[in-house]
């Protein structure tokens, strides 16, 4: 089947893992406590704090305890949805203030633009919140790349290493899974996408291969047919 849509991961694929771990995560860890204290009474933040209490099993946690739980989750690199949402809010403020610029590899920028011009639909699937995804591409070093994408998916669609998540995403996109190409640097994610019927391509930017999947080192090496 002809590829009609491309679904891409972010970390290690379109963007450097170091940007997320060396820039975004430390920025959120530094600014999240004060952000939560300042905005705890606002509905959007209050809803996420309620989710923190529910997920941690600490129904009576006050704001300071909730902050401590969030910082612990950051230290554990836990993919908790309320943490991702609050990190996204902190990053949004940082992008608005000009303190952050999203990193996207130049080869990815060029390929994404070319694919869009050819009429391919582009989508993102990342463990980072949809809000955070939009910020990385919308406030990137290459400018606003947001208009290139037709949609974004995060952990609300399911874990990235489970095939059901990819079947769900294919349904949301409205195409047979076989007409969607998934790009990632993680074998288990590629396996899950393949099990759901998607075409897969691995990104190994430092060289090497991703077992069981065609692998390239750069978006410049990707041929979409």
Swiss-Prot record:
Its EC number is 3.1.3.77. It is an enzyme of class 3 (hydrolase). It comes from the Bacteria. Binds 1 Mg(2+) ion per subunit. Its cofactor is Mg(2+). Pfam families: Hydrolase. One of its GO terms (biological process) is L-methionine salvage from methylthioadenosine. The keyword Amino-acid biosynthesis applies. GO terms for molecular function: 2,3-diketo-5-methylthiopentyl-1-phosphate enolase activity; 2-hydroxy-3-keto-5-methylthiopentenyl-1-phosphate phosphatase activity; acireductone synthase activity; magnesium ion binding. Keywords: Amino-acid biosynthesis, Hydrolase, Magnesium, Metal-binding, Methionine biosynthesis. Pathway: Amino-acid biosynthesis; L-methionine biosynthesis via salvage pathway; L-methionine from S-methyl-5-thio-alpha-D-ribose 1-phosphate: step 3/6; Amino-acid biosynthesis; L-methionine biosynthesis via salvage pathway; L-methionine from S-methyl-5-thio-alpha-D-ribose 1-phosphate: step 4/6. Bifunctional enzyme that catalyzes the enolization of 2,3-diketo-5-methylthiopentyl-1-phosphate (DK-MTP-1-P) into the intermediate 2-hydroxy-3-keto-5-methylthiopentenyl-1-phosphate (HK-MTPenyl-1-P), which is then dephosphorylated to form the acireductone 1,2-dihydroxy-3-keto-5-methylthiopentene (DHK-MTPene). HAMAP family: Salvage_MtnC. This is Enolase-phosphatase E1. It comes from Pseudomonas aeruginosa (strain UCBPP-PA14).
């Amino acid at each position: 089947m002809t590829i009609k849509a491309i679904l891409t991961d972010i970390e290690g694929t379109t963007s450097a893992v170091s940007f997320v771990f060396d820039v975004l995560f430390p920025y959120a860890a530094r600014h999240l406590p004060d952000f939560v204290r300042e905005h705890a009474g606002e509905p959007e933040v209050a809803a996420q704090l309620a989710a923190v209490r529910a997920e941690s099993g600490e129904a009576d946690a006050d704001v300071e305890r909730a902050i401590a739980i969030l910082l612990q989750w950051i230290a554990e690199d836990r993919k908790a949805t309320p943490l991702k949402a609050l990190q996204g809010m902190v990053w949004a403020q940082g992008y608005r203030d000009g303190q952050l610029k999203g990193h996207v590899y130049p080869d990815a920028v060029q390929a994404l633009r070319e694919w869009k011009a050819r009429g391919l639909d582009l989508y993102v699937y990342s463990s980072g919140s949809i809000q955070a995804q939009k910020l990385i591409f919308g406030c990137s070093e290459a400018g606003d790349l947001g208009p290139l994408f037709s949609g974004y998916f995060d952990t609300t669609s399911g874990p990235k290493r489970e095939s059901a998540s990819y079947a769900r995403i294919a349904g949301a996109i409205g195409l047979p899974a076989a007409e969607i190409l998934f790009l990632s640097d993680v074998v288990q994610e590629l396996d899950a996408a393949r099990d759901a019927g998607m075409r897969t391509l691995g990104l190994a930017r430092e060289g090497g291969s991703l077992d069981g999947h065609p692998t390239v080192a750069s978006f410049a090496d990707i041929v979409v047919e």
